[in-house]
């Protein structure tokens, strides 16, 4: 009897242990469906013009996030953030596109899921914006192709993490392709009754009301509808495979829509994204929200990787800067989300943003450059030229001119609750002085804490980093960041004497920001011009180019051009990209630079033949060569008529 009792106890313990093991290894499947270039223009977000039944149904079954934000208003920095769980500005992957490396231990968070037995698939876009992209792909994905699918896992019981990237709403489809191509390849996918009528399209106040703009906005909505059909197909496959009851589903876009004033802008129209997360009943305990609910909790792309790891029971690496917003032991919510805008293709820029649940603060560090800078690839779209035409004819309201004009405010502040389209800048409002100060301080604290490498010009960054990654150099605290930050913060605010003082610094990056500060001023003295002329041989080419630009902008073009034409034929294509863009923006008054720009163009074409599609991402100098060609073509076209 005693023996039987002991045997029964042993058997019970074994069974309990077996159940514990089963419970320990059971993991949810994760499905990510990512739309390209799409704002929350969905029925479930209150857009009555949108036709999105499949996504709307998912929202009724899941949780809708009303305050979800990208980290950048363009794709490749966003994807760098999503795959690493780190701010691109801390990795030096903030430019589009970047050739800097990241540390080898940053394999991509799906690699950690693979370590735990997950089958991971990516269909199909990568664009991780780093020299290490091949290593990330190899480590992260069991399958990475346009046929990658959870259905290809070797065992049906194996948990999966699958991504489907839908290009249907991408800027190429919504505004760049010729309209005839859009009709053939996108509009043909949707029912005739679902085609959006241009006459009925709701135009935001920052868009002029013309037939062309109406047609293009209706076209964008058609792209969203076609994308919704694809979402429905994927969700149907999941249901048909009897997997919906064990799969957590994320639907989101990589940033705002590809239309003007959306993509590339730190305004809510460029950064606010739809996010819907579905939890089956089995895994409902991992979400604090009930199905069909809406939450206004702030979430950012930097948090997605750590959230997936937390949902699947994987410990977050120390290097991840994001914090989980779902899963066990989530006790705090975000107070702020942060955004960055840097070089995109040939277009140079640097701006930063901070947003809380109500207010958006933007700091433009190159306020002498407008929102609507000329840019080769999007300029293939007719809608861009409609904006140029109306701006030239001065047929724009103040809300439209904010985007189309040649300059930007140094600081912007918007009450997104009462002004969701960001039309009224409150930065100079006495009533909002304390709010402005709080968000400005938060911005300074964030770029300092995260060591924002975007404040280093690219050519200088390459010199500084050497064989180390930007992350490693930033974490070592060997960069004199506070000195650089303080010089940049003066742009648009400080006096001429402060910028001249910065030009005398031993730090080349401080000198660089001193030159930009002078460029951004409406006028400078003859004394300042004289000092700039003396400094034209600065050993840093980035600084030299900006000194020349300051002279050119302030009517000393003849003194400036020799330095620029020298730089445009430099051996380093990062220097060439910088110089070519500077010459391009100077336009007709830089006519003597034509031979140098023709030479730079010929070199660029040899490196990257012009028949290579602009959407094809190539490593190293090949992408830079495309950006050089963009600027050279645009500049030389001025003189063809």
Give the label of every model feature segment:
Residues 11, 347-349, 409:
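Short beta-strand-initiation
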Residues 25-28, 35, 64, 272, ...:
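Long, internal low-complexity/basic segments
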